[in-house]
């Protein structure tokens, strides 16, 4: 008996990407897989007919764009599977990608989330195995709250030479292809929809770890991703969501003692980042302003964030020292 798996794909106005991804998923070798496409506020009449072309695929339509987080949560509500995979619509897949993930999940009852190896799609088509920026071989974080990945630091990505081909515990699983035990996602309330997009998977992974679940990489499972196809890297909107959601995530999940030293330092670092963005052309003023917009969001929403924090901290079963035992102080000085 194979555990059932629903692939949940939030979709927003890129039919060419979705069609390519669904074509690839059709080649997946797994007998108990279904697909849920969540249309985030779109009005494309042809989307219904597109989804009907694929076996075991169905469409859920939302009246408004609720972002990646909201689309995934709606898919979760419509799923009755044992496991779900939250997946970007600009992906392609090795035929055995899902079987490897299911096997890894069945080996350990404490698994909350798993991440496949994520390679960059376009270089792969040219014969180059390069890790994808958005997840690579597994998500990590430093003690200042800056995320990085095995196989990627800052904007630099490594060639996949098998250096991360042993599965290991990671800090977060990428939302490009995030395999999750459905009961765990429901227990934790799914994604925080106030994130809208960017870093919501880090927040959910962090809450899983606080609740005592494991997050691991499964490098035998391979997914290919066309990074930046939905929102270009370096855009003011991407800068805004990354800075905004990173601070929200810290406020929710870090200990009170850590926040006493971390928040003043992060304020200084964000101001420094805004000055750096001013030197960029074109669009430096908008990029710099995005940092202050992010800061303003967290100030205005501080009370609501603290309410979420109380919920997270009241249910945690793993202490701060255990969570950060192998986490570097800064990715500048990681060993």
Each language-model region and where it sits:
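Short beta-strand/loop segment that forms part of the nucleotide-sugar
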Residues: 32-41, 60-62
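A short, conserved alpha-helix in the catalytic core of glycosyltransferases
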Residues: 165, 169-222
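Short, acidic, metal-binding catalytic loop of nucleotide-sugar glycosyltransferases
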Residues: 23-32
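Active-site-adjacent helix/loop segment of glycosyltransferases
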Residues: 211-307, 315, 321, 326
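A conserved acidic beta->alpha catalytic loop
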Residues: 24, 39-48, 64, 94
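Conserved donor NDP-sugar-binding/catalytic core segment of glycosyltransferases
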Residues: 92-135, 139-146
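Glycine-rich, basic loop-to-helix element that forms the pyrophosphate-binding segment
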Residues: 62-79, 89, 100
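Short aromatic/hydrophobic "clamp" motif used to bind/position activated sugar donors
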Residues: 84
């Amino acid at each position: 008996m194979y555990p059932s798996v629903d692939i949940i794909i939030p979709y927003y106005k890129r039919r060419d990407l979705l069609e390519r991804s669904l074509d690839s998923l059709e080649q997946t070798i797994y007998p108990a897989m279904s697909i849920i496409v969540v249309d985030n506020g779109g009005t494309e009449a042809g989307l219904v007919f597109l989804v009907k072309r694929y076996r075991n695929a169905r469409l859920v339509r939302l009246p408004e764009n609720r972002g990646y987080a909201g689309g995934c949560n709606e898919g979760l509500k419509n799923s009755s599977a044992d496991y779900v995979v939250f997946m970007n619509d600009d992906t392609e897949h090795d035929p055995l990608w899902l079987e490897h993930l299911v096997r890894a999940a069945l080996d350990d009852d404490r698994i909350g989330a798993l991440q496949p190896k994520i390679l960059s799609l376009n270089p792969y088509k040219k014969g180059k195995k390069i890790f994808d920026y958005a997840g690579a071989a597994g998500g990590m974080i430093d003690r200042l709250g800056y995320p990085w990945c095995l196989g990627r630091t800052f904007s630099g990505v490594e060639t996949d030479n098998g250096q991360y081909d042993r599965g290991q515990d990671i800090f977060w699983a990428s939302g490009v292809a995030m395999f999750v035990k459905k009961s765990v996602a429901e227990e934790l309330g799914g994604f925080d929809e106030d994130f809208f997009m960017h870093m919501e998977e880090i927040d959910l992974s962090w809450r899983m770890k606080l609740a005592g679940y494991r997050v691991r990489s499964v490098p035998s499972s391979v997914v290919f991703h066309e990074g930046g196809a939905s929102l270009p890297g370096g855009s003011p909107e991407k800068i805004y969501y990354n800075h905004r959601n990173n601070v929200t995530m810290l406020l929710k999940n870090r200990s009170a003692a850590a926040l006493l030293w971390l928040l003043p330092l992060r304020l200084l670092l964000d101001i420094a980042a805004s000055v750096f963005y001013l030197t960029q052309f074109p669009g430096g003023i908008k990029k710099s302003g995005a940092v202050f917009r992010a800061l303003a969001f967290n100030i205005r929403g501080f009370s609501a964030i603290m309410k979420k924090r109380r919920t997270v901290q009241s249910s945690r079963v793993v202490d701060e020292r255990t969570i950060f035992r192998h986490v570097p102080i800064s990715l500048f000085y990681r060993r």
